[in-house]
C-alpha cells in the first residue's frame, strides 16, 4: 500500500514520492518476534534446570527410603541367625528383600541414580560376618553430601557401626562413633566428585 508524502511545500510546488508503510511495521514485528523467542529460550533453560534439580531431590529421597527398607529387611530376615553369613547381592535378591525396582537381574542391584548397589558382610571386633554393608555408587556431589549428612542413627541401639564416604567407587574415609552423623564440612570435603562417581557405604549390625 502506498501513500504520497510532501517532499517540498515551498512556492506552491508539491513534489511527492511514494512511501511503503509496511516496511517499518515488518521490522518492528521481527524485533518483537526475536524478543519473544529469547524469552522462551530463557524460560526453557530455567525450566530444564528446575526439573533436573527436582528429579535429583526425588532420587535422593527415593534412595534414602530404599536404604532404610533394605536395612530393615536384612535385619528382620537374619534376626534368628547367629550372623549374616551368606548375605550378598544374589541371595538378597533370592530372599526377596530387594525392592523390585532395584533388581537389575542376576546379581545386579541398582539404585535410583542407576548406580551399583553392593550388599555384603563385614567383620566387627574380630567376629566374621557380624555385620552387613550396603554400598551405593554412582552418586553426584549433591546426593552424596545430602545422604552422608543425614541421621542414619547413632549408638548401639541403631545398629549403625560406621559410614564410608568417597569421591570414587572405591571405599573412602570411614566415620564411626561420635563422628556420626557426618558433619557437613567433612561430607563436602569427601564428596568432591565433579561427576556422578561418588559412593557411600553403611555398615550395620
Which residue stretches match the model-derived regions?
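Periplasmic/extracellular, small/polar-rich flexible segments of pilin-like filament-forming proteins
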Residues: 79-205
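N-terminal single-pass transmembrane signal-anchor helix
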Residues: 16-59, 63-66
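Membrane-proximal N-terminal amphipathic helix
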Residues: 49-89, 95
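Cysteine-centered motifs
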Residues: 6-9
Amino acid at each position: 500500500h502506498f501513500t504520497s508524502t510532501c517532499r517540498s511545500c515551498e512556492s506552491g510546488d508539491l513534489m511527492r514520492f511514494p512511501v511503503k508503510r509496511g516496511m517499518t511495521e515488518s521490522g518492528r514485528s521481527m524485533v518483537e518476534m526475536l524478543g519473544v523467542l529469547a524469552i522462551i529460550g530463557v524460560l526453557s533453560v530455567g525450566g530444564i534446570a528446575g526439573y533436573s534439580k527436582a528429579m535429583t531431590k526425588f532420587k535422593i529421597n527415593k534412595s534414602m527410603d530404599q536404604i532404610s527398607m533394605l536395612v530393615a529387611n536384612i535385619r528382620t530376615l537374619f534376626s534368628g541367625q547367629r550372623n549374616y553369613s551368606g548375605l550378598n547381592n544374589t541371595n538378597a535378591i533370592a530372599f526377596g528383600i530387594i525392592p523390585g525396582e532395584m533388581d537389575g537381574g542376576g546379581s545386579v542391584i541398582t539404585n535410583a541414580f542407576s548406580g551399583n548397589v553392593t550388599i555384603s558382610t563385614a567383620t566387627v571386633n574380630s567376629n566374621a560376618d557380624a555385620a552387613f554393608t550396603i554400598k551405593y555408587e554412582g552418586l553426584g556431589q549433591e546426593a552424596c553430601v545430602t545422604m552422608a549428612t543425614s541421621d542414619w542413627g547413632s549408638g548401639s541401639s541403631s545398629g549403625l557401626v560406621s559410614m564410608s564416604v568417597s569421591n570414587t567407587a572405591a571405599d573412602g574415609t570411614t566415620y564411626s562413633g561420635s563422628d556420626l552423623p557426618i558433619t557437613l564440612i567433612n561430607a563436602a570435603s569427601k564428596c568432591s566428585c565433579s561427576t556422578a562417581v561418588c559412593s557411600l557405604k553403611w555398615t550395620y549390625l
